[in-house]
Amino acid sequence: MAVDVRATRLMVFLSEDDRVGHRGLHEALLERAREDGMAGATVWRGIEGFGSSGRLRTARFPDALTGLPLVVEVVDSPERIDGFVSVVKHLAPGSLITLESVRTSRHGPGRSPALDDPGPQGTGRHR
């Protein structure tokens, strides 16, 4: 049986060169999303792209493989994503952030407590 749930998708647009200390910014965001119990997160690596600088970054040339575009995508309930946006703004100031309303549809035995249950006293926390 399919279970449809309203959710929000947060996308953060970065470069492989973006750092927090010695780590990639995408790693820091992914780890924090996991620690915060978000329903799901993925890092996508682009083969080409440009941002506010207008500089094209591409994988077409082997000597230009640094700084390719990355997108960190996080999906969870609207309330939990709203709370996570402040984390993103703190770790990735100046990064482009987009928010979209999505409908998740799960078929089969998979379960995501963060989307299925609002958590204790509606906090959405599941730890």
Please identify what each model-predicted range represents:
Residues 1-127:
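Positively charged, small/polar-rich N-terminal and surface patches that mediate targeting and assembly
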